[in-house]
Every structure is written in C-alpha cells, then in structure tokens.
C-alpha cells in the first residue's frame, strides 16, 4: 500500500511532535495499516459518519486520534490530534 500524507496531516504531525507525544505509537499504527494488518481492538478503529463517511478513525491514545482513508492502493493520512483539535 502507498502512503500519502495530506498537507493538513503534515501540519498536525509537526504540532503533535512539538507537544512531546510519543510518535513511535503513531508510526506503529501507520505501519500496521500500510501492511494491511487489522488494528488490535485497543485502537478502536471505526468508520466515521456524516461528511467524513469515507474516512476511518483510530485512537493512538485515549485523546489522540488518527483520521485516514483507503483509496485503491493508497493509505491517505488526513488528520491527527485530539478530539477538540479535529472536531471543532
């Protein structure tokens, strides 16, 4: 699977890094997704609804989310951050 990072994801990633989050957790989840492996239940991976119905969300930590979608052979990383940062 090809990994695609949106411009917004890149901004979110820089912000998360600046906040001192452990990026290894995020990298681990991304690696599983790229390899096509199902995420373990503790990540609470699920489909979103409404305008984001083509997207999925998983929890890196209790209040740290990754929003992504799969289109063909592409894993598109859309956003990462807390609930309040992503759903204003």
Ranges and model annotations:
Residues 1-62, 70-76, 85-88:
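Basic, Lys/Arg-enriched alpha-helical interface segments
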